[in-house]
A protein has these predicted regions:
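Core catalytic alpha/beta fold that binds nucleotide/phospho-ligands
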Residues: 1-193
Length: 193
């Protein structure tokens, strides 16, 4: 299973003041806070760790169908600047991140899905939410169809009762785990192949 998350750094700077009293305490473990405060770029590290938590949470949700908000129960560990792990209730997830011009993008996966997925992060052509969602859906369907040599017209995305997107070939649910994300001017997808 896989999950992803991204942060538009300009929008995050407008929406969240990570330096305000209590922000770090509410979202990050003491080890994570130490990592942030000792970092050469604390702002980047805050959003890197956050995207690791969110992407791993999406995998956990697909596996356990159990929603919760307890960010400190998601413990991040950076192995390299762009690779790490997240531990959630004794389940270990691996992450790979891209720190780009204006964004941080992370994909989380279980060990057996490492390097077995398509992933793409892109800048939107418009700022309208509905158009952004449509553009993201079109991109994931086109990439999946191209990889598997399927006609894209037969593929569709529907959300289940938990709001998790699922991929269909006609009326048949496909077992390929995938995840969509967008924030501000950026969108991304990852899908098992």
């Amino acid at each position: 299973m896989i999950g992803n998350d991204l942060v538009d750094l300009k929008l995050a700077a407008k929406q969240s003041n990570w330096q305000r009293k209590g922000f770090l305490d509410k979202l990050f473990t003491s080890t994570e806070q130490e990592c942030i405060l000792n970092s050469d770029n604390p702002v980047e590290t805050v959003w890197l760790l956050w995207s690791m938590k969110e992407s791993a949470y999406k995998v956990y949700l697909q596996m356990h169908n159990e929603r919760f908000f307890a960010p400190k129960k998601l413990a991040c560990h950076l192995i390299l600047k762009n690779k790490g792990t997240v531990l959630i209730n004794n389940a270990l997830f691996f992450t790979e991140s891209e720190i780009g011009e204006g964004f941080i993008y992370t994909v989380a996966f279980t060990k057996n899905h490492e390097n077995n997925f398509l992933s793409n992060c892109f800048e939107f052509e418009c700022s309208d939410f509905k158009n952004q969602q449509s553009q993201t859906y079109q991109k994931v369907l086109a990439a999946f169809a191209n990889k598997l040599k399927l006609p894209v017209a037969q593929l569709k995305i529907k959300k289940n009762g938990q709001g998790i997107p699922q991929l269909f070939w006609g009326d048949m649910l496909l077992e390929n785990s995938f995840s969509l994300t967008h924030h501000g001017n950026f969108g991304a997808f990852c899908i098992e192949v």
